[in-house]
């Protein structure tokens, strides 16, 4: 795909596309993976008296709709932290989620339970999202929330939880950007949500990161990090 903004990554016996929408798509199964959506996080902050912008959940759902449409996914798997907290269940957030689901009635949706989901409750089930209390498993991939749960010899695993970012350094300044982080057979996705922080993991010599911008690009290993 020479003109595609995606980066094609071989994970034998399958192949996935790392998308600048901060998602992973497996064409063979039609499955789109995202992690750490954190819907309603801004509403939680406002409920606790912290002034933050409105509209971040709507922006996140718009990007999710665009990702589904661009790749033609038939299944969506959220790798944990779909909602941020119980206070995320504001009327505006729930209305936005209901409208999003109404626009995608044929999309099979599942959520691998993350640490925030356990506190937020399983409200997503009312919108047709199946909650999984263990890893999501197919013939080719495993999906978990925390990379620490990922050790299964010989299996490729997709994970979230970390919100990986990488620092790109210029001569006079630097910039932190979201990235996909591959260590061994574990691919950790960047946080999908519009209102999320990031963590710079300590990268090993064999690790590979894929920088997210207008397109997804591998960061040369010899580049100082």
Regions found by a protein language model. Name each.
Residues 1-79, 84-225:
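Extended recognition/assembly regions associated with phosphoester-bond processing machinery
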């Amino acid at each position: 795909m020479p003109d595609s903004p995606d980066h094609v990554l071989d994970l034998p016996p399958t192949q996935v596309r790392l998308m600048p929408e901060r998602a992973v798509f497996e064409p063979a199964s039609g499955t789109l993976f995202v992690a750490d959506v954190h819907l309603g996080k801004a509403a939680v902050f406002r409920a606790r008296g912290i002034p933050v912008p409105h509209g971040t959940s709507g922006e996140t759902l718009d990007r999710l709709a665009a990702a589904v449409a661009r790749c033609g996914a038939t299944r969506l798997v959220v790798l944990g932290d779909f909602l941020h907290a119980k206070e995320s269940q504001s009327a505006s957030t729930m209305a936005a989620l209901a409208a999003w689901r109404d626009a995608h009635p044929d999309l099979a949706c599942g959520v691998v339970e993350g640490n925030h989901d356990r506190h937020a409750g399983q409200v997503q089930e009312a919108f047709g999202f199946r909650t999984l209390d263990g890893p999501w498993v197919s013939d080719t991939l495993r999906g978990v929330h925390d990379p620490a749960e990922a050790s299964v010899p010989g299996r490729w695993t997709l994970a979230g939880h970390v919100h990986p970012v990488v620092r790109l350094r210029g001569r006079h300044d630097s910039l932190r950007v979201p990235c996909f982080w591959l260590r061994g057979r574990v691919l950790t996705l960047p946080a999908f949500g519009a209102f999320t922080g990031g963590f710079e993991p300590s990268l090993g010599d064999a690790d590979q990161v894929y920088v997210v911008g207008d397109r997804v690009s591998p960061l040369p290993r010899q580049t100082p990090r």
